[in-house]
Amino acid sequence: MAKIKARDLRGKKKEELLKQLDDLKNELSQLRVAKVTGGAASKLSKIRVVRKSIARVLTVITQTQKENLRKFYKGKKYKPLDLRPKKTRALRRRLNKHEESLRTKKQQRKDLLYSIRKFAVKA
């Protein structure tokens, strides 16, 4: 089998991808048997190509699954941890804009009574 391109895989359905994955795994096992029995050099170099193709198929499968999950959870209140944005622990625990802007009654009164003084400088 020739090298598989990821862009060709993206248009396929999951069943087709799984079938292709199974074919690639069978081919890899045959190549490994040929390696043990002393196969041709062309078969030995093909092992690497098949392994990388398997990785591409698996990558496309996981990416499409994750994309579908993102669509499903869009607009919902809670999302799975792996779909949430990966930030530092401190950033995840930080107050949001609304919570930061909240003021106590005492602070509101203080701001009202003692507003910031503006001075004009005479040139």
UniProtKB/Swiss-Prot annotation:
Pfam families: Ribosomal_L29
Listed GO CC annotations: cytosolic large ribosomal subunit
Keywords: Cytoplasm, Ribonucleoprotein, Ribosomal protein
InterPro entries: Ribosomal_uL29 (IPR001854), Ribosomal_uL29_CS (IPR018254), Ribosomal_uL29_euk (IPR045059), Ribosomal_uL29_sf (IPR036049)
Superkingdom as given in the UniProt entry: Eukaryota
Molecular function GO terms recorded: mRNA binding; structural constituent of ribosome
GO annotation, biological process: maturation of LSU-rRNA from tricistronic rRNA transcript (SSU-rRNA, 5.8S rRNA, LSU-rRNA); translation
Family listed: Belongs to the universal ribosomal protein uL29 family.
NCBIfam families with a match to the protein in the record: L29
Protein name: Large ribosomal subunit protein uL29
Protein source organism: Hippocampus comes
Gene this chain is encoded by: rpl35
